[in-house]
Amino acid sequence: MENLLEIDSVQLKFGNRTILNSIYIQSETGKITGIFGRNGCGKTCLLKLLFGEIPTYEKSVRINGKALLENSRNPNDMRMLPQFNCLPKHIKVIQAFQYFNVDYDEFCSFFNEFRDWTHLKMKKLSGGHIRVVETFLILKSSAKFCLLDEPFSHLSPKNVEIFMEIMKHEKEKKGIILTDHMYRYVTDISDDLYVLKDCASYKIEDINKLKEYGYLK
């Protein structure tokens, strides 16, 4: 089944500063949606609005036309990978996979070193290895939509390439929205692109527009 996620009618301010205003962004099954924007332009805030982490009545978030009125999200609808590590440090690696109901053997087929770390606690892993676990769990979850905030941070180029291939496979079953400062990776993997600028969103129909905005040379 194809699904459609939309957000618009956003008004987000912190004090007297407007963060987001004229916004419309959509994600759908079968597509990866990349979002560009300078530091402080509201990319993370936008993902948090979609995920319900920033409470404001001045927004409309819809899945298949049905408004999501509560601030909490059904994990079957949406999962989010934040910029910071989010898994509890005291749990074992295998326990995280059991909680998300994700195949650990499949994970190890991509990242073989984890076969020796099955019962290691998360706090014993490096930040990069934790990121690998968390990103895989979100992408392989049963959610209709995955929101990824800086998914390539702390990853080696090899692991970035692995996750780009995983995203290409997973998008057949879900919609994926991602932001990242590694702009070339975002343009290479995305089907749709948006730029956040001056509190508004702009859909990029021509890749050369990204040169005008200063994201590509």
What are the residue ranges of the model-derived segments?
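Walker B catalytic motif
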Residues: 150-151
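Conserved structural motif at the start of ABC-family nucleotide-binding domains
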Residues: 5, 19-22
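Conserved beta-strand-loop-alpha-helix hinge in the C-terminal portion
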Residues: 200-217
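Helix-to-loop junction immediately C-terminal to a conserved catalytic motif
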Residues: 51
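ABC ATPase NBD coupling module
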Residues: 54-55, 66-79
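The feature captures the beta-strand-to-loop junction immediately N-terminal to the Walker
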Residues: 36-38
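Q-loop/switch helix immediately C-terminal to the Walker
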Residues: 80-105
